[in-house]
From Swiss-Prot:
It comes from Human herpesvirus 7 (strain JI) (HHV-7). GO terms for biological process: DNA replication; viral genome replication. Belongs to the herpesviridae HEPA family. It comes from the Viruses. InterPro entries: HSV_HEPA. Component of the helicase/primase complex. Unwinds the DNA at the replication forks and generates single-stranded DNA for both leading and lagging strand synthesis. The primase synthesizes short RNA primers on the lagging strand that the polymerase presumably elongates using dNTPs. The primase-associated factor has no known catalytic activity in the complex and may serve to facilitate the formation of the replisome by directly interacting with the origin-binding protein and the polymerase. Associates with the primase and the helicase to form the helicase-primase complex. Interacts with the origin-binding protein. Interacts with the polymerase catalytic subunit. Its main location: host cell. One of its GO terms (cellular component) is host cell nucleus. It is found in: Host nucleus. This is DNA helicase/primase complex-associated protein. The lineage of its organism: Viruses, Duplodnaviria, Heunggongvirae, Peploviricota, Herviviricetes.
Length: 659
C-alpha cells in the first residue's frame, strides 16, 4: 500500500536482538507520518541494518558516566554519544536517510501488515509540505533536592554540571499538557491508571507485532511538536518526560522503547538550548521565548525545525544532514573555517580592544566623524537561496528568520556539506572586501561588522545626500560583480552626524541607536552618552552632563518594574551567576546585574527581581563617559568627572530604594 504525505519526526524505537534468527543489534526506527489525504498522524516502523557493538556502546553512554569530575572526560563522553546517535540516524540504510527529511512531500510504501515502511519515493523536485497541526504546550513546576552553594562556587563549568555531579534531582512536581485549548493537569503523586487515562486525551496507543515481538506505539493526536518556555528548567522537563515514559511502559509485555536525552546541560560549558529525546517520545521539543504571551504558528514551528537541517543543535555538527547544492560547487584548497563566520569583526586600526579577565573583551571607539550604519538586509538569505535547495530552507517571510539565525544554519553545513559552506563564506567574504574597498575610496573606514551583514563606517563630515546614494550604489555594484546576479540587495542605512561612539562588552552601546524607538536601558544610555559627548567638545560642560544623566535616570525610574527593559542575554559560564534552583545556566540565558558585578537569573515571565542593582547600570554609563574623557582631556577634567559620577549616584540612590 502507498501513502502520500510528509514525515513529521523520525526516531529510534529500540536496538533489537532477534535471537531466533541470529540477527543482533538491529535498530528499529519509528516514523511519525502525516497522511495528506486523511489529514491524520500515523506511526510506522522501519527495520534498519545491523550496527556494531562499539557504536551501540557509545550510544548507550549513561548520564552517570558523562558527569565525571574530569571535564575533558565529560566532553569526550558526550561527544562520543552524540556523534554515535547522529551516525545511527543518518548513517544507516538509505530508506532511513530519506525519512530523515521532514516536511517534504513524499510517498511511503507499506508492507502487508500496514505498519512497516519498506520503501520511500521522493520526487526529484521535492517541495515543502507543512501540515497545519497545533503544537502541544507543556508547563511544569516542581521542587528540587537541596545542595550547598559552596559546591557551586568554582567557575570551571556551569552550575548545571556541578549540580548533576552531586545527584541533584526533582523531588516532586506538577505539570500540564495543552493542545488547542484542551488542558489536562498531572501530578507526580497520581496512579498509573489515572495518568494513562489522561494521556489517551492526547495520544493513540496501539500494539504492533513485528519480528515475533510486540511493540507499543504511542502516536500523538494532531500534533508533532511539544513547546516549552525558554525559562523552564531542563531537569524538570526530563523528569516529567521520564515520568510519562515509566507510566506508559510499566507492566507492559512489549519491547520497551529506548528513552534517553541530549541537551545543553550535558556539556560542561553549556550549549545551544535545544533538546532531543532518543526514542520516547517520538516528537520534536522546542524552547520558545515568552511562550505565555505568544504561541508560534505552524509555519514558525516548521521553520525552526528546518533550521536544524537534521537533528537539534545540541547534537553538534554531526547532527546536520548532507545537503546537495543547486549549483556546481568547486572543491576548495584553501578552506575557510568556522571562525570566518564570527559574529563580530573589528578594525584594529580604528577600534580599541581591551582584554578583560573572566569576561568578554571590550571594544570601543570615540570620534568626531560621522557614522554610517549599513544593514545588508538579505544578502545571507540570497546566498542560501543561490546554493541550497529550496526544500532545505525555511520560509523567509517568517519574521523569526533573522540573519544571525541563518548564520547558525550556515555554520551547521561546515562538516557534512563543506563545499556549500565554503562557497557561501567565500562569497560573503569577497563581497564584503569589495564593498569595504569601495567605501574606502569615499573616505569611509569600517569599524565593526556584526553578524556578517551590519557594517559600521566612520568618515569626515560630508553631505549625507551625496554619501547615502553612493553607499547604495556601491552595495549593488559589488553584489553584481561578485555574484553576477541581477537581484538588487535590500539595504538600510542609518546616518548619525557629529560625535559618535561605540562600546561593546557584555552590552552594546552606540550612538547608532539614538534614533531607535526600542525600549531598553542600552538605548536610553546610548542617547545620554551621545548628548554628553556632543555638549563637551570644546570644554567639559559638567552642568549639561549632570542634566543628561538626570534625564537618563528619570527614564530608568519610569521603567524600573519592566523586566524586558533590563534583561540581557548572556552566554553560559562567561560570568559569575548567583545560585539558583534548577538547571538554568547551561544555555544562553536572560539575567540582570546585581551587586558586586554578579548576575542573577531573570525570567521573562516573572516580575523583576528586587535584587537588581540599578546603580550598576548608571555606573556603566559613567565609566564609558570617563573612558571617552581620557581620550580628549586632562586628568583635572577626569577627576572632576569622577566627583560628578559620585554625585549622580548619591543624588539618585534613594529613588530606586536599593536594598
Amino acid at each position: 500500500m502507498q501513502m502520500r504525505g510528509c514525515v513529521c519526526h523520525l526516531g529510534v524505537y529500540c536496538v533489537h536482538n532477534d535471537w531466533k534468527n541470529k540477527q543482533y543489534r538491529v535498530p528499529i526506527y519509528q516514523c511519525l507520518f502525516f497522511n495528506a489525504e486523511t489529514h491524520s498522524l500515523h506511526t510506522f516502523l522501519v527495520i534498519g541494518n545491523e550496527i556494531s557493538e562499539n557504536l551501540l556502546d557509545k550510544i548507550s553512554i549513561s548520564k552517570e558516566k558523562i558527569f565525571m569530575w574530569d571535564l575533558n572526560e565529560q566532553i569526550m563522553s558526550i561527544t562520543q554519544k552524540t556523534e554515535s546517535i547522529c551516525e545511527l540516524m543518518f548513517g544507516n540504510k538509505q530508506i532511513i536517510q530519506k525519512l530523515s527529511r521532514t516536511f517534504i512531500f513524499l510517498t511511503i510504501i507499506l508492507n502487508s501488515n500496514m505498519y512497516e515502511i519498506i520503501d520511500v519515493c521522493i520526487d526529484s523536485n521535492a517541495v515543502l509540505y507543512m501540515p497545519d497541526l497545533r503544537p502541544m504546550i507543556i508547563r511544569c513546576v516542581g521542587n528540587y533536592s537541596k545542595i550547598s552553594s559552596e559546591l557551586l562556587s568554582d567557575s570551571d563549568c556551569t552550575q548545571a554540571t556541578k549540580k548533576m555531579r552531586f545527584d541533584y534531582h526533582v523531588t516532586n512536581f506538577c505539570f500540564s499538557l495543552n493542545v488547542n485549548g484542551k488542558k489536562v493537569l498531572f501530578s507526580s503523586t497520581e496512579s498509573s491508571e489515572s495518568i494513562l487515562e489522561k494521556l489517551l486525551e492526547f495520544f493513540t496507543i496501539q500494539t504492533y507485532k513485528l519480528a515475533e515481538e510486540q511493540f507499543l506505539m504511542v502516536t500523538p493526536k494532531n500534533f508533532f511538536t511539544v513547546l516549552f518556555d525558554e525559562d523552564m528548567c531542563l531537569l524538570l522537563l526530563q523528569t516529567v518526560v521520564s515520568f510519562l515514559y515509566d507510566n506508559l511502559f510499566r507492566n507492559k509485555l512489549v519491547v520497551k522503547q529506548v528513552h534517553d536525552y541530549i541537551g545543553p546541560d550535558l556539556w560542561p560549558q553549556g550549549h545551544e538550548r535545544a533538546v532531543y529525546f532518543v526514542g520516547f517520545p517520538n516528537m520534536w521539543f522546542l524552547s520558545i521565548y515568552d511562550l505565555d504571551n505568544k504561541i508560534p504558528c505552524i509555519k514558525n514551528i516548521c521553520n525552526r525545525i528546518l533550521l536544524y537541517c537534521g537533528l537539534p543543535d545540541s547534537l553538534g555538527p554531526d547532527g546536520c544532514q548532507s545537503v546537495p547544492s543547486t549549483q556546481c560547487v568547486d572543491e576548495f584548497e584553501d578552506l575557510p573555517n568556522l571562525g570566518a563566520l564570527q559574529y563580530l569583526k573589528y578594525n584594529s586600526l580604528v577600534v580599541t580592544m581591551e582584554t578583560v579577565e573572566n569576561s568578554e573583551n571590550v571594544y570601543y571607539f570615540f570620534g568626531e566623524q560621522d557614522l554610517f550604519i549599513v544593514k545588508l538586509v538579505d544578502i545571507i538569505q540570497s546566498l542560501l537561496e543561490l546554493y541550497v535547495p529550496k526544500s532545505f530552507l525555511p520560509d523567509f517571510s517568517d519574521a523569526y528568520i533573522k540573519s544571525e539565525i541563518l548564520l547558525k544554519f550556515i555554520s551547521r553545513l561546515h562538516k557534512k556539506s563543506n563545499n556549500i559552506f565554503c562557497k557561501i563564506v567565500k562569497k560573503i567574504t569577497e563581497f564584503l572586501r569589495c564593498f569595504l574597498n569601495a567605501c574606502r575610496l569615499m573616505d569611509l573606514n569600517w569599524m565593526f561588522i556584526r553578524n556578517m551583514h551590519i557594517v559600521y563606517f566612520i568618515g569626515p563630515k560630508k553631505d549625507p545626500s551625496v554619501v547615502l546614494p553612493l553607499l547604495k550604489t556601491s552595495v549593488e555594484s559589488c553584489w553584481k560583480k561578485i555574484l553576477n546576479s541581477s537581484r538588487t540587495p535590500v539595504v538600510n542605512i542609518n546616518y548619525i552626524p557629529g560625535y559618535n561612539f561605540l562600546h561593546s562588552s557584555c552590552s552594546f552601546l552606540t550612538s547608532g541607536d539614538i534614533n531607535s524607538e526600542d525600549s531598553h536601558w542600552t538605548i536610553t544610555a546610548s542617547k545620554c552618552l551621545y548628548n554628553c559627548l556632543g555638549a563637551s567638545q570644546i570644554t567639559v560642560d559638567f552642568k549639561n552632563i549632570y542634566t543628561n544623566f538626570q534625564q537618563m535616570v528619570s527614564v530608568f525610574l519610569s521603567h524600573r518594574y519592566e523586566n524586558k527593559y533590563w534583561i540581557e542575554y548572556f552566554e553560559p559560564n562567561n560570568y559569575f551567576l548567583e545560585t539558583h534552583e534548577g538547571l538554568l545556566d547551561c544555555n544562553r540565558y536572560t539575567a540582570v546585574w546585581t551587586t558586586e558585578n554578579k548576575l542573577i537569573r531573570q525570567s521573562v515571565g516573572y516580575p523583576l527581581t528586587d535584587k537588581i542593582d540599578f546603580i550598576h547600570y548608571i555606573q556603566v554609563v559613567i565609566e564609558i563617559f570617563k573612558k571617552w574623557l581620557l581620550t580628549k582631556y586632562s586628568q583635572q577634567e577626569y577627576a572632576e568627572t569622577v566627583r560628578l559620577g559620585s554625585k549622580i549616584i548619591s543624588d539618585h540612590l534613594h529613588l530606586f530604594n536599593v536594598n
